[in-house]
């Protein structure tokens, strides 16, 4: 069974490889029919003490939803199950799970003591009849969603060999009101769209939030003092502070991978240049010095390089330079313009927005510019952000017209398994956090 | 350039003369200065208080437009800015904010930078016409504040703009 999953991963890799070499037919190389999600039996979390709370069932649903949402797993309808699981301690009747085509089996039970809960869980390979994981988590009730996501991450990791991405959050801009005067508010939600929380009132225009590596802060653009400036929002304390005082507008901020620096653009005269700001001593370092628009910087995960966009060639194109600002080399050479580059947390790919023939696309290329591949193409797709495992992207898609607006989507980097994230209203500028726990 | 300056100066004097006069003569001057022969326009003109933001918007023209991804001022844009400069010379106590804007057909951060450039270029032109830099601020809005909401060139061309806004006393 595990071999089969490895084959699935291999298939993914091969598809990536082939779609990379045959650039001409990018969008159709990966079709759903090529991939068979692994059937998995996720039995309802046993909750003998507090069945009326429904917590066991809630956790079960979140785990199944996470795994199904990844596109790599197919949770089997519980109505098909032949065996009722009453205890995690007893070995299951593997044959009855193989009969319903389950290749993996998840069982769990909840034990509560006042406000503390403990979940014991196991993951089984139904063919080798071996336990792949046997573990427990202790939590308070309000953390049940995190616990479900953490367990789903564990299952994902055990069965794919990849790190998970379910116990994560998305920072985004919640939009409301007419297109000509849209209210924009800083917001966060769980990766699956649950628990949306508005962080700002909407009085000031805010844009482009990005998570700090530890998930505790957001760096973003706000018009609260009239001029657009880069601010940091502390999620726990709800405090906001401006990132340095600069003579002009600052924008396009991002944290360094270690969280100690901010890289951003400063508008000076007719050009915009890149600066790095040290958050401990507020030292600033100039990284570019031209009269072009140099913006949208993003560090490589090892902090050694920076990818950014510049219109110095006449159109927006992607460039990589050393973190100190030297050795600038252009990496995008296809038809059209390229912008919003973001380096994958794995270091392999750079995701971007591409504008060509009036269409807005999301794509990825290797960090040296080779292997460009378009993932989605349409009227307006913009602003990719990476899941912490570098396998999944989110971006926003804007619909045209007077009532048009933005919605956030997730998609596998193969282009497969695109899904809309349900948000209370229009939503844009997603930023994916690292794993929270 | 010298010729243009002289012309501006004469326009300025003419405006001073007229705008300090009564509203009925202003209407005629509108027609002389800006070719506003249209009666409806003249009607609006007569309602605006001289030196007000309405006067500026209606009688001078508060905005200039740009081609896609462009930050260059065409002749129409320059003519509007020249009228703005003349008006600002008439009212030296007035300051303005020049808002830069872009259409929705670009990525967010680039559009912010592009709209900043548009505002700056409009301001540079006003300064070249003698308007002191400390009377003019800029705010770039990128694609965040379109005036026209449709998704076609008819709207995008209206949204690629630099708008001069008269700062009014609170």
Task: Go through each PLM region and give its residues.
Chain B
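A non-catalytic structural micro-motif
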Residues: 92-101, 116-147, 160-170
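A generic structural micro-feature
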Residues: 154-158
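Periplasmic peptidoglycan-binding/tethering modules of Gram-negative envelope proteins
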Residues: 23-95, 168-170
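C-terminal motif of bacterial Sec signal peptides marking the signal peptidase cleavage site
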Residues: 18-21
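Bacterial N-terminal signal peptides that target proteins for export
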Residues: 1-11
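Short beta-alpha junctions and helix-cap segments that line functional grooves
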Residues: 148-152
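Extracytoplasmic/secreted proteins, especially bacterial periplasmic and envelope-associated proteins
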Residues: 76-83, 109, 117, 121, ...
